[in-house]
């Protein structure tokens, strides 16, 4: 049996991360990997879910400054990693996470302009460089992604940011993803059926390379 793995799905709003998480979970089950935990960041613990609501809430006169947003993201992330992700992996459970540390580099680093060295310092200090075994980055143009997001629900605080913000965020995502050998880039501008097919193909190829 393959040792439990930590798989992360990344991408802008409307990229199809939820669909990808479900697709991968079902694919793992078809390949006899039945113990799978789905989580989301920020969230998936009581404390982290409260932080999520705070981050996404629109305040009349006191929205979060970018540094506060970054630190809250890390507070939620650390809580989830220590309370759920690490224990699950230790017990042989595979973990699929909707977002992880790359989101902070892209959103707070690329989009909001916080120096990336600060984010790397937080990663090193609090996560001890805890990184995924595989990241799947769903690359979608901001125009297409936000149009999809608008069809779901009213936009939250982060989703309501400017197109320029999301273009900077996407640029950072692509820059980091192309440099990471553990990251697979999927064209998420395509329809959901084609994206699912491409994810399945890439995942099966990756699974076949894992050491038992």
UniProtKB/Swiss-Prot annotation:
Q: Which SUPFAM superfamilies does the record associate with it?
A: P-loop containing nucleoside triphosphate hydrolases
Q: Mind listing the UniProt keywords for this protein, alphabetically?
A: ATP-binding, Kinase, Nucleotide biosynthesis, Nucleotide-binding, Transferase
State whether keyword ATP-binding applies.
yes
Listed under GO biological process in this entry are:
dTDP biosynthetic process; dTTP biosynthetic process; dUDP biosynthetic process
Q: Where does ATP bind?
A: 11-18
EC assignment: the record states: 2.7.4.9
Q: What does this protein do?
A: Phosphorylation of dTMP to form dTDP in both de novo and salvage pathways of dTTP synthesis.
The record's section on HAMAP family has: Thymidylate_kinase
Q: What is this protein called?
A: Thymidylate kinase
Organism of origin: Buchnera aphidicola subsp. Acyrthosiphon pisum (strain APS) (Acyrthosiphon pisum symbiotic bacterium)
